[in-house]
Amino acid sequence: MQNGLRRRVAGQITLSALVVVGVIYMFASLQRQLIYFPQVEPEDKLLRVAAAAGLQPWRDSSDALIGWHTESANDQSKRVLVFHGNAGYALHRDYYAAGFLAQGQYWDVYLFEYPGYGARTGAPSEVDIKAAARHALELLLSHDARPVYLVGESLGSGVASYLASQFPEQVAGMLLVTPFTSLTDVASHHYRFLPVGALLSERYDAQEALSHYRGPVAFLLAGSDEIVPTPLGQTLYEGYPG
């Protein structure tokens, strides 16, 4: 009888261990599907959407689409580069362009598109998004010496913070909307039973990045955000050394 009990207990432990290992494996292998929710559309459709919003396609020297922009007629205008959240595509955030342009002919607004989102080719990952964002900023900086400001929304706050750490002299200031300390901290909040720190490849460590930037930063936190816990944004704000 005791041997039978031992076998049942051992079987339950083995089954539980297999379930845990399976969950960990699924999280590790599917993490990008849990982070990125791109909406893909044909470029001709997005060209019509952009035109209705007063935006033009933004392309690099090889004519590849990297986002959307609207330019003022004022050659003294400032430039703002916007990084959206993890879902949809850049044109879903055309309200940023409308908001800046409502102030008058003072801003050239650029809505950056992530690889694999909208009509942009590629697939989203932290490495590829950061590389593409760096290329976009370098493209703007190569045109002229006007100031460039960054706006980062949710996931985009991690991208903007990274760029500020890499170009601390060229980034004139930032607005971070519903930001977080790191994606690892966000994931740890939602998956407390998993060793997220050891599994997550996409980290977007905004807190570490901001330690290398001293320019002006405005933080806009949500009172009850179900995705990005407000305390993470508060921690980022309180720890910012600039």
Language-model features: locations:
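An N-terminal hydrophobic leader/cap segment in hydrolases
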Residues: 12-59
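Short alpha-helix in the alpha/beta-hydrolase fold that links the catalytic acid
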Residues: 95-96, 206, 215, 229-238
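Gly/Ala-rich beta-loop-alpha elbow adjacent to hydrolase catalytic centers
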Residues: 152-156, 160
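Active-site nucleophile loop of the alpha/beta-hydrolase fold
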Residues: 175-185, 202-206
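Active-site nucleophile elbow and catalytic-triad environment of alpha/beta-hydrolase enzymes
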Residues: 195-209, 214-215
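Short beta-strand/loop motif that positions the catalytic acidic residue
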Residues: 212-214, 218-225
